[in-house]
Regions:
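N-terminal beta1-alpha1-beta2 module of alpha/beta enzyme domains
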Residues: 1-68, 169-171, 275-290, 299
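Hydrophobic faces of well-ordered beta-strands that scaffold small-molecule active sites
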Residues: 3-7, 34-36, 74-76, 104-108, ...
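Active-site mouth loops of central-metabolism enzymes
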Residues: 5-16, 79-87, 169-178, 241-255
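Active-site beta-loop-alpha junctions enriched in small/polar residues
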Residues: 8-10, 39-41, 79-81, 109-113, ...
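Short, acidic/polar
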Residues: 14-26, 89-92, 175-185, 250-263
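An alpha-helical appendage that flanks or caps ligand/catalytic pockets
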Residues: 28, 32, 125-167, 196-300
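Internal, glycine-rich beta/alpha segment that forms the wall or movable "lid"
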Residues: 44-49, 76, 82-189, 204-223
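Glycine-enriched alpha-helix->loop->beta-strand junction motifs that scaffold or abut catalytic
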Residues: 68-71, 100, 187-193, 268-270
């Protein structure tokens, strides 16, 4: 079993260097991956948690971490794909894959915040089709020596696109979400499945559904990565009203933490991302260290 940890770009840490320091720390502690999240505005549950404190850009954060780490996978959990032009995003992430020596994984989702879609001028009703098409465009650019693509949104022929990513045929895309649409997307297009906040029971059920759909589509599920992101309670209780309705792992009792992780392992999770639910840098450091030294070795 592999373990990742979130770098708190989304927790309002006002000294950005304090947030960035958790990337090298995660690597030194033996974590397999570091992850960042994606939102544009402090609205809804984010405002409830941060007020006006900073939420840093995910790709800028990963770019910095690519230079301060050498081993850990660099992931997004998740990038809201409809917010990003796929041609520009393919270029950025391929460059980042080169800079990092092939360590980029894109966890992607369709998005859920109406205000952000409105601010970008993107119809929220098109978010699913946009997500699917963005995946196709990026893979065409990453993998084809002379990429071509035609749709009502994007049109190009016989272009020369560089750099190609280190990882071939393309950067891995792990599909986030557990909705029916996300399940179909993971089965048909995902290199992995990476939902957040689902219980072990739901994970096992949805995993079986994805495997069945993928096999029906002629895909080899043995090549898929089964991942999940779960909030770890740095202090007892959820971080927001939204988090209260989602599955969480206790962080104040390491025996219970291990039992919760075992349940995800038994449900079929291979790469578990631990999202520490605090902006208190001292508590983040303490919890990262205790998990790495006392809990994670039980699952290696």
């Amino acid at each position: 079993m592999q373990f990742g940890v979130t770098v708190p770009n989304n927790w309002g840490i006002e000294d950005v260097n304090e947030a960035l320091a958790f990337g090298p720390l995660a690597e030194a502690l033996g974590y397999d991956s570091v992850w960042v999240m994606d939102h544009l505005f402090n609205n809804g549950y984010i405002r409830e948690r941060l007020d006006d404190k900073p939420y840093y850009h995910p790709l800028a954060t990963l770019t910095y971490l690519s230079a301060t780490t050498s081993r850990v996978l660099l992931g997004t959990s998740v990038l809201v794909l409809p917010y990003h032009n796929p041609v520009e995003l393919a270029k950025y992430t391929a460059t980042l894959d080169q800079m990092s020596g092939g360590r980029v994984t894109l966890g992607i989702g369709v998005g859920a915040m109406t205000e952000e879609f409105e601010a970008l001028g993107i119809p929220m009703s098109e978010r699913a089709s946009l997500t699917n098409e963005c995946i196709r465009v990026m893979r065409e650019l990453w993998s084809n020596p002379a990429p071509s693509y035609h749709s009502r949104r994007w049109n190009f022929d016989d272009l020369r696109f560089s750099p190609k990513p280190v990882q071939q045929p393309h950067i891995p895309i792990w599909v986030g979400g557990a909705s029916p649409g996300a399940i179909r997307r993971a089965a048909r297009m995902g290199d992995g499945w990476h939902p957040s906040g689902v219980s072990p029971e739901e994970y096992a059920s949805r995993k079986a559904e994805i495997a069945e759909l993928a096999q029906a589509a002629g895909r080899n599920v043995d090549n898929m990565v089964w991942s999940a992101r779960v909030e770890v309670e740095a202090t007892p209780g959820p971080s927001s009203e939204r988090a209260a309705s989602r599955s969480r792992i206790p962080g104040h009792d390491l025996e219970q933490t291990a039992l919760s992780i075992a349940a995800y392992r038994d449900a079929g999770v291979e790469h578990l991302v631990l999202a520490l639910n605090t902006g208190d840098v001292n508590r983040i450091r303490e919890l990262m260290e205790s998990l790495a030294n006392e809990t994670i070795p039980q699952f290696r």
